[in-house]
């Protein structure tokens, strides 16, 4: 039986195939691709995601309309039950096509536009997709967490941050090689987690409870190393 990681990536691959030529023009973001960043042998499984987040280089209504017309030719249609104009559906799969910069319809994640230039290719289920560097992925998640303002113990964005810190072997090195702006943001994130009055709890509640104390200390060490960059 496929696990969460395999199921998430299988759905991402199905979306990539449906996009066809447009697949070369987008970057996959969000929790559906998080297992790509899990380089730790024996990494825990990520959570299942309800939708696929795809970043697109559009910023005007006319560009969004042109994208809508292109997607319709690929049997990808606006979700009639969607809560925002960026949500589409394809054979029961929910897909959010997120603009890479702010539009007249509202803000977007400020790390998507710089992330587009730094995206790299990887292959899943036999098809190539573009994803963000792990440092920028963390920056998008930190901004998303702050914009929603939820308790870190119950936040999917914060859960994803902890998952990457726990399961990516090269995260500190990647942050060290990132831009000064990314480093500044991730240092703020690190300070928040380490200085939180319930620091251990907000980390350990998102990781395997059998090894929570050991892995939690390992994550805190990574955060300290990020602060020293």
Region spans (language model):
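Compositionally biased terminal segments of proteins
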Residues: 1-229
């Amino acid at each position: 039986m496929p696990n969460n990681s395999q199921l998430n990536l299988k759905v991402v691959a199905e979306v990539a195939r449906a996009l066809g030529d447009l697949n070369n023009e987008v970057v996959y973001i969000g929790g559906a691709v998080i297992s790509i960043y899990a380089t730790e042998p024996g990494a825990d499984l990520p959570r299942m995601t309800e939708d696929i987040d795809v970043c697109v280089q559009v910023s005007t209504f006319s560009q969004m309309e042109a994208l809508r017309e292109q997607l319709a030719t690929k049997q990808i249609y606006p979700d009639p039950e969607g809560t925002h104009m960026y949500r589409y559906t394809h054979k029961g799969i929910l897909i959010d096509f997120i603009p890479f910069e702010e539009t007249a319809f509202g803000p977007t994640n400020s790390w998507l536009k710089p992330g587009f230039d730094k995206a790299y290719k990887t292959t899943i289920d036999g098809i190539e997709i573009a994803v963000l560097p792990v440092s920028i992925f963390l920056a998008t998640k930190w901004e998303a967490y702050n914009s929603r303002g939820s308790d870190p113990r119950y936040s999917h964005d914060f859960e994803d941050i902890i998952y990457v810190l726990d399961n990516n072997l090269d995260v500190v090195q990647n942050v060290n090689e990132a831009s000064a702006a990314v480093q500044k943001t991730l240092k703020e994130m690190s300070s928040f987690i380490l200085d939180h009055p319930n620091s251990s709890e907000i980390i350990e509640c998102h990781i395997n409870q059998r090894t929570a104390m050991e892995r939690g200390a390992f994550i805190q060490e990574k955060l300290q190393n990020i602060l020293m960059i």
